[in-house]
A protein has these predicted regions:
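A recurrent domain-boundary module in secreted/ectodomain proteins
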Residues: 216-233
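Consensus positions within tandem repeat domains that build extended binding/scaffold surfaces
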Residues: 1-3, 22-26, 69-71, 91-94, ...
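Structural signature of tandem-repeat unit edges
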Residues: 5-19, 28-42, 50-66, 76-89, ...
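C-terminal tail/sorting-segment detector
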Residues: 263-279
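Short loop/turn microsegments at loop-to-beta-strand junctions
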Residues: 34-35, 243-246, 262
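Residue-level detector of functionally pivotal "anchor" positions at catalytic/ligand-binding pockets or at interdomain
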Residues: 230-252
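Short, conserved loop/helix-junction motifs that constitute active-site signature segments
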Residues: 166, 186-200
Length: 279
């Protein structure tokens, strides 16, 4: 909107502003005057400015609601990002091409742009919030190191090429007994959501009784290494109380050794839970 307005030095945003377009204030006097680091506009993380040191880990400010499109695009040296619980929106290609090793999306996220983490070839794990309804197109495309992904029961739709060329994907866990719709490729009766994932080496874990539905669903029908699990076992783990020690569970809520291969539900000593992938 104001890109290239070289004399624009001051910006005041309305509290009702819904979003800021990618690069909207690039090439302005305002941006040139900002110090190096994460540049903020009100509650928006607009972009990263300056040179980033290798192995950088950043924590966005509490109260940040939006990460603008391409805000950290091609920040190769960004190895970690701490996203605050206040965050609601991640823009298109916001973290594409970064060196992130893992990412955990906060629970209030309700909108994620296409290709948000595309090309993050070092990304090993990603945690999606339980209220997410859509995984947008190309969200994790070309994340070659991504070993496992857990798709919440709330997810109903997965955009085209969301997991395109995720060559290292060994385990997909979908908690929805109804297969999420995989976006068709330009109106065709096939999809590229999982194109490049090797079905010979990737296990699909799905709720008990849903094998027939997944086997008949476009996109999901490519997987033949399928295992059913009882989601209620995990719910029991998540609702349990703190025990004062760290305990590992499988997807059926059964206690397992900490070095067992696959997806673990880890209940920490304080009662908090997280999902991890053990190779």
């Amino acid at each position: 909107a104001f890109q290239g307005c070289a004399k624009l030095a001051d910006i005041n945003l309305s509290a009702s502003l819904a979003g800021i377009g990618t690069g909207a204030f690039d090439g302005t006097a305002w941006l040139n005057a900002q110090p190096d680091g994460v540049v903020y506009l009100s509650t928006f993380a607009y972009k990263y400015k300056g040179t980033m040191a290798e192995g950088t880990t950043l924590a966005l400010l509490d109260g940040t609601t939006d990460v603008c499109g391409r805000a950290f695009n091609n920040c190769w040296n960004l190895a970690g990002i701490d996203l605050p619980e206040s965050l609601k929106t991640i823009g298109k290609e916001a973290f594409s091409g970064t060196g992130l090793l893992s990412v955990s999306l906060p629970s209030r996220i309700d909108s994620t742009g296409e290709g948000a983490f595309s090309g993050c070839d070092k990304l090993v794990s990603a945690t999606l919030p339980e209220n997410l309804t859509t995984i947008p197109a190309s969200m994790f495309s070309r994340c070659y190191a991504l070993a496992a992904i857990s798709i919440p029961a709330s997810v109903e739709y997965i955009g085209n090429e969301a997991f395109y060329s995720c060559l290292g994907l060994k385990e997909i866990t979908s908690f929805n007994p109804v297969p999420p719709v995989c976006e068709p490729f330009y109106g065709e009766n096939w999809t590229m959501v999982f194109d490049g994932v090797n079905p010979e080496h990737c296990t699909l874990k799905i709720p008990t009784g849903s094998t027939t539905s997944y086997a008949a669903a476009v996109g999901w029908d490519m997987f033949y290494l399928c295992e059913e699990f009882d989601p209620s076992g995990i719910q029991g783990v998540l609702k349990g109380k703190a025990s004062g020690k760290t305990v590992h569970y499988d997807l059926n809520g059964r206690m397992i050794l900490s070095n067992a291969k696959g997806i673990h539900i880890v209940r920490e000593a304080d009662g908090s839970c997280r999902k991890i992938w053990v190779k």
